[in-house]
Amino acid sequence: MKKTLIFAVGMAVGSLVLSGSARAHHGEAGRYIEEVVEITGTVVETQLVNPHSILVLDVATDGKNVRWQAEMGGAQQLIKSGWTNDVKPGTKVTLTGRRLKSGAPYMNLTERARVILADSGKVVMQNANYGQPAPNAQ
């Protein structure tokens, strides 16, 4: 009985601790919520991995290349939503997503976002809520 109670309490405490970590991991405190920006650049690298895939690209800004990173959903999520191998190094893409508050060249593409092949206009990825205002926008 005592071992069962200790185990149950341990599991409950562990669940609370882990749920707080997950909530903090997906928190919006570091990102613009209302402001969605668009950038166009050349893909340097794609990392289709879990839990979040990364797209790295060079964007011409004021006559020089700035290296951007864009965080997306996991590999399986992207593949199920239609992601193809069209996005590879050297491909020119246009990204629409949310930029960090700090102004760092980092974009979140997990909601209200899309990826377009710049040369053909083909939409490679678009979230279901693309084009909608932020949930708390007035």
What are these regions (language model features)?
Residues L100-A128:
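OB-fold/S1-family single-stranded nucleic acid-binding modules
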Residues L18-A24:
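Sec/Tat signal peptide C-region and signal peptidase I cleavage site
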Residues A8-V17:
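Bacterial N-terminal signal peptides
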Residues V49-V59:
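Short aromatic-glycine-enriched beta-strand elements
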Residues R67-W83:
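Beta-strand/loop nucleic-acid-binding surfaces
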Residues A29-V49:
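Short, glycine/small-residue-enriched coil/turn segments at secondary-structure junctions
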